[in-house]
Swiss-Prot record:
Record GO terms (molecular function): D-tyrosyl-tRNA(Tyr) deacylase activity; Gly-tRNA(Ala) deacylase activity; Ser(Gly)-tRNA(Ala) hydrolase activity; tRNA binding
GO biological process terms, semicolon-separated: D-amino acid catabolic process
Organism ancestry: Bacteria, Pseudomonadati, Pseudomonadota, Gammaproteobacteria, Enterobacterales
Gene name in the database record: dtd
GO cellular component: a single term: cytoplasm
Major site of localization recorded for this protein: cytoplasm
Top enzyme class: hydrolase
Pfam families assigned to the protein according to its UniProt record, in alphabetical order: Tyr_Deacylase
Protein name, as recorded: D-aminoacyl-tRNA deacylase
Annotated organism of origin: Salmonella agona (strain SL483)
Keywords: Cytoplasm, Hydrolase, RNA-binding, tRNA-binding
Entry EC no(s): 3.1.1.96
Amino acid sequence: MIALIQRVTRASVTVEDEVTGEIGPGLLVLLGVQKEDDEQKANRLCERVLGYRIFSDADGKMNLNVQQAGGSVLVVSQFTLAADTERGMRPSFSGGAAPDRAQALYEYFVERCRQQAINTQTGRFAADMQVELVNDGPVTFWLQV
């Protein structure tokens, strides 16, 4: 399971001209689910994402996680993160989880975030989405379990 996380001042996702999720300061999480992923990996990745200290403390050091910083989370499914790009000029998506399994793990990940009392917004699984964000820093990290 892969999360591309970005520290943002604001972010939103729109599907068919409808805003389905919107946050102020916090994390935009682009989530990719791979074939071998399961609930245990989703738990570990959620723990890492929410615990990752990429927000500045009073001294300006990256020392706070999203909850300590009072931020929110916007989770957007992105199967392209599971692509194999090592050969050729076209990505292969054979490493991605089957759609039903990927959706179940995506929804499980979102629910785990919500259980941590963090405002968690979402896109719509498998939809054509427009994501708008203001990356703060810029600060972007690739987390994989």
